[in-house]
């Protein structure tokens, strides 16, 4: 039976929103992952805390390949991920939600693919639509019905971290078309696509990026805003889980057909 995966980012560690939960671990070829399995209205849900349940893993140290491989092994076909982001776009204000549709990759030291030769062919992932349009539409519909300010579309700039960005970097990202900035969406989105899972990110605007606002950036500010948005996020995720047809097949589920499909 197909499952829905939820990857919780900063401030999103509470799997108790689901039913029949139990904690498990799984060894993958890339290391061990911890996860929580539960149900919601009869659908199987797998929850992974991206930074660890105690927020001990910084963005550049996250084992992205283990997380995605593990979710695939557990039968996940849809992934809803959450990210806390800064805004480069004056129309995307703190407290708003953004359903990212494109990204700019400014990471430096991360392994971004499962396809490194050896047992796998040389493969070139098509990322024309890296964030599943059908899943984004579901989230947009649910969010709008719930009265959220939710933007369907936006370009996420992913930086290496763990430091925040300089005002000069933010100015450059804005000139390149960036709308939000964060540290975790790449390579997660690429790996999910290689593993042929429909993937969408709910980005929560927690602050304006450096230089957009004159105030200094703090992690505490991010966590505080996440706390304020937590109830809305919970309702959005649960509403989306209700709306997802786990038997549906989208382009994302056949992303690697040219290479014989993704094999564990």
Where are these regions (language model features)?
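Metabolite-binding pocket within alpha/beta catalytic cores that recognizes anionic/polar moieties
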Residues: 1-128
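Active-site rim beta-loop-alpha module in soluble metabolic enzymes
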Residues: 130-175
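Short acidic/polar active-site loop segments enriched in Thr and Asp
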Residues: 77-78, 179, 198
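Generic hydrophobic/aromatic pocket-lining and core-packing "Φ" positions
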Residues: 68, 170, 186-189
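Zn-dependent metallopeptidase/amidohydrolase metal-coordination segment
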Residues: 183-221
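His/Asp/Glu-rich mid-to-C-terminal helical/loop segments that flank catalytic regions of hydrolases
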Residues: 210-257
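Non-catalytic positions within long, well-ordered alpha-helices that form the structural scaffold/packing
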Residues: 72-75, 174, 193
């Amino acid at each position: 039976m197909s499952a829905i995966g939820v990857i919780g980012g900063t401030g999103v560690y509470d799997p108790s929103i689901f039913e029949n939960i139990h904690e498990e671990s799984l060894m993958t070829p890339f290391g061990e992952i911890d996860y929580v399995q539960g149900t919601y209205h009869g659908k199987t849900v797998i929850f992974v805390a991206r930074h660890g349940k105690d927020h001990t893993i910084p963005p550049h140290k996250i084992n992205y390949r283990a997380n995605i491989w593990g979710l695939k092994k557990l039968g996940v076909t849809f992934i809803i991920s959450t990210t806390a982001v800064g805004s480069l776009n004056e129309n995307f204000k703190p407290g708003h939600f953004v359903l990212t549709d494109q990204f700019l990759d400014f990471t430096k030291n991360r392994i971004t693919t499962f396809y490194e030769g050896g047992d796998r062919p040389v493969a070139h992932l098509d990322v024309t639509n890296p964030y599943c349009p059908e899943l984004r539409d579901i989230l947009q519909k649910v969010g709008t019905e719930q009265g959220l300010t939710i933007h369907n579309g936006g370009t996420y700039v992913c930086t290496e971290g763990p430091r925040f960005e300089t005002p000069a970097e933010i100015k450059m990202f804005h000139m390149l078309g960036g709308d939000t900035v964060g540290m975790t969406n790449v390579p997660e989105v690429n790996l999910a696509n290689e593993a042929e899972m429909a993937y969408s990110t709910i980005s929560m605007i927690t602050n304006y990026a450096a230089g957009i606002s004159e105030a200094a950036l703090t992690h505490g500010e991010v966590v505080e805003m996440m706390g304020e948005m937590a109830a809305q996020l919970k309702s959005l995720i649960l509403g989306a889980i209700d709306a997802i047809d786990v038997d549906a097949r989208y382009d994302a589920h056949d992303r690697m057909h040219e290479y014989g499909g993704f094999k564990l």
